[in-house]
Amino acid sequence: MFKFDNLILASSSKQRLCLLNQLGVLPGEIVIPNIDESPLKKELPKIYSMRVAKEKVIKVSLLYPKRFILGADTVVCCGRKILPKAETEDQAFEILELISGRRHRVYTSVYLYVPGKKLHYRNVMTVVKIKRLSVKEINSYILSGEWKGKAGACNIQGNAGKFVISMNGSYSSVIGLPLYETYSILSQYFPI
């Protein structure tokens, strides 16, 4: 693993750091970009994901204009409805009930700020189908607490993985950072 002192990860996500480490990359610093992540009125999920990821990177780049900034955002949606990160057990139950037995889309956008105001980005869509969940399964999963802070209230690396019937797209993107796309951007500037 190589530490790149001039690379900042603009994220509070432990999963994103772990995925970045899988590429052999250790950022010099992690900065949490405190931005408003509320969707705009009638904003489509893909556009939302791209906007939020870009805003994270730009916010941190204003503090560190001479460093590379990597940021990402993941959003889960059913149709055009953006599903929030559940904040309560009741909200998690509603989200899980909504995606139960259905296909839903996961968009992850990744941005790299390059000193000099250049931005590179990629957006990845993955379609995930979850089995029809019983009330007992939903309640059991909620008790695990794994839904906290997760887009769509699902942690497919944990207990929710057993509910996934199919996935068409990038597994790492669903977790929070599309590895292939991130590698293709970073490898232009870093020896990875």
From Swiss-Prot:
Cofactors, names only: a divalent metal cation
Main subcellular location = cytoplasm
Annotated catalysed reactions: a ribonucleoside 5'-triphosphate + H2O = a ribonucleoside 5'-phosphate + diphosphate + H(+); a 2'-deoxyribonucleoside 5'-triphosphate + H2O = a 2'-deoxyribonucleoside 5'-phosphate + diphosphate + H(+)
Active-site residues (renumbered): D73 (proton acceptor)
- One Pfam family matching this protein: Maf
Q: Which UniProt keywords apply?
A: Cytoplasm, Hydrolase, Nucleotide metabolism
Protein location: Cytoplasm
**Gene Ontology process terms (BP):** nucleotide metabolic process
Record EC number: 3.6.1.9
Query: Would you tell me the Gene Ontology cellular component terms?
Result: cytoplasm
S-S bridge residues: none
User: What's an example of a GO molecular-function annotation for this chain?
Assistant: nucleoside triphosphate diphosphatase activity
SUPFAM superfamilies under this entry?
ITPase-like (SSF52972)
What is known about what this protein does?
A: Nucleoside triphosphate pyrophosphatase. May have a dual role in cell division arrest and in preventing the incorporation of modified nucleotides into cellular nucleic acids.
**What's the family?**
Belongs to the Maf family.
Cited PANTHER family: BIFUNCTIONAL DTTP/UTP PYROPHOSPHATASE/METHYLTRANSFERASE PROTEIN-RELATED (PTHR43213), BIFUNCTIONAL DTTP_UTP PYROPHOSPHATASE_METHYLTRANSFERASE PROTEIN-RELATED (PTHR43213:SF5)
> This protein is called what?
Nucleoside triphosphate pyrophosphatase
Naturally occurring in which organism (per UniProt): Ehrlichia ruminantium (strain Gardel)
